[in-house]
Each structure stands twice: as structure tokens, then as C-alpha cells.
From Swiss-Prot:
Keyword ATP-binding: yes
SUPFAM superfamilies linked to this entry: P-loop containing nucleoside triphosphate hydrolases
Free-text function comment from the UniProt entry: Catalyzes the transfer of a dimethylallyl group onto the adenine at position 37 in tRNAs that read codons beginning with uridine, leading to the formation of N6-(dimethylallyl)adenosine (i(6)A).
A biological process from GO: tRNA modification
Family: Belongs to the IPP transferase family.
Subunit and interaction comment: Monomer.
UniProt enzyme class: transferase
Name of this chain's protein: tRNA dimethylallyltransferase
Annotated binding of substrate, by residue: T41, G42, S43, G44, K45, T46
Binding annotation for ATP: G39, P40, T41, G42, S43, G44, K45, T46
Catalytic activity annotation: adenosine(37) in tRNA + dimethylallyl diphosphate = N(6)-dimethylallyladenosine(37) in tRNA + diphosphate
Amino acid sequence: MRAPEFQANAITSTGCDVCLDPQKSFAKLFKRTIILLAGPTGSGKTDVSLCLAPMVDGEIVSVDSMQVYRGMDIGTAKVSLEARQRIPHYLIDICHVQELFNAVDFYYQATQACQNILSRNKVPILVGGSGFYFHTFLSGPPEGPPADREFRDHLALYIQKNGLSLLYDNLCMKDPEYARTITKNDKNKIVRALEIIHLTGKKVSEHNWSMEAKEPREYNCRGWFLSSPRDLLRDNIQLRCRRMLEDNLIDEVHRLLEQGIRENPSASKAIGYREWIDFIDQGSPKEAYEDVKNKFIANTLYYIKKQRTWFKRYPMFRELPTLGLTAETIAEKIAEDYFLHG
């Protein structure tokens, strides 16, 4: 089936020029159930999605916080240009590496992309491993004030100098009730909580914001989570990281440094980039290469563990074991289930 001639990657707004409540118009446009395809890094989501899209007459929306950036190609295992020409993809290569892109931007742009796809009687297929972005799509954008970059930079310097545990102790003094609900190692939530206190003058626990995951109400979704045995996934990740280095990941990091990736605190801290930025900053010592490579692999494996934990919160993502199955067979299983129950 030939993909329609549509410039999917041209969607570049940050949400200010789309409808204020996109879910309301979403319900009017709904004709088919939206497919959610998740899985840990290295589980084969991309290959499965490319097989699945023609089976269901679908178009693909990337659920990846780093694939939005032009030039971050090797380290994000970005789908090839040839594949994007065959099957329309959204939310890939839409930002310069210095631009900030957050969950609110994702919510509006992903919603706009799905509206576009549904309006042409196609099936949106959301594909990725970012549990937070899936949560945002299903539950709406995060509540609370927008991020304060200057304050976050201040906290980053504090952590670098004093450590995260002291920052957590600070939160415990300012908002002990909320601090008890998170771990002392959850840097993102600690920083966000202190940021909210700084911006609003109120404790997080005093705000009437919902922090729980919600099921989508205004449109139907059906989700799958690709599952592989841990030892197999570990072997795949080791091979994947080595191949990225063989494909000149370090050269890509050099180019991104020239383009100003340091100005973007999210992009510069992404796995696969932060390790090699530090390596380059140290003068690229040959004796440190193996240690940095092993750290790159270890950080990826730790992230996979977090991905598994996140998606366990969502029963709507049906676990789909993939051991011994080809991407095409997995896609056929999803398509069959989709047409039976979607």
C-alpha cells in the first residue's frame, strides 16, 4: 500500500496555534482506535511499526523526547529517511538541538498529528519508549507552572556541588508530605517540586493537582508493550551500543556540540550523548574509551529497567512476548487483535 503524499514532518508548532482543548475536537474526528506501541529500548518497536503501518493503513507518531531533534540520529536509533518517505512519520526532526521541547509541546503536537491522521481516515500509531510522554498523551499535559530554566540551572549547580541527597533534605524541610511520596534518588521530581515551591510560594502537597495515571476518556486507544527476556535484551543493547559507536556516534556528538547542544539541558543529558560529551570534555583519552563505553551500556540498561517499571502502571498496555518472533509476525498479531477488538 502506497503511503499518501503528505509532509508529516512539517508539523512544527509548539502548541500555541492549535486548539486550546484538542481532545474536544479529537472526539469529533475519531473514526478508528489509536494504536499505542511501546517497549523498552532495543525491543524492536521501529521494525514492528514499519510492518504494522501498511497492515492497518496507519501513520506513525514518534513518542520519543530526543528524536524531535535534528542531528540526534545515531544515538536515538532514528528511523531512516527512506522509511519515513514510505510511511509518514510525525514528531521527528522538528526542532533545532538548542530548542527546548517538553511534555506539553509533545501533548499538543501529538494530538494535532493524530487529528490530521484521523481526519483522513487513517490509523494513528504512537510508537516509542517514553512512558512519561505516553502518560501525557493519555492524561493531558502536566499541571502546574512552566519550567524555570534559570532556577533549574541553579539547582543543577547545587547538586553538582553538594549532591542530590542534600537537595532532597531541603525538600523534606519545605514539603515533608510530598517528599514522603517520592524517593531520595528521583532527581526530576525533587527538582520539579522545589521549582513549584519557588514559583508558586506553595507546597506541592497544597496544590489540588492529580498525579495519578488516568485512562483516556474522549477517544479509544489500544496498547501493546513488546517484552523480551532480560538476558536477550541485555545482549541486544550491548550490540546496539557497539554498532552506534561503529556508525560514528562520537562524530555525531562533536557536530552537536558545534551546534550548541550544551544549551539544551535535556538533550545534552540524554543517554548516549552525555557520556560522550564528558569523554570529549576530558580530551577523548584513549585509556578512558572502554570505561565510557561500558557506562553508556550500563546507563541504557538502567533506563530499560525504569521503562519496564513505568509501563507496569498501565494495564491498557498488553504485554506481547516477542522471543523467536519476527517483526512481521509481531505486527500481524497486533493487527489481528486490533481488528478484533479495536
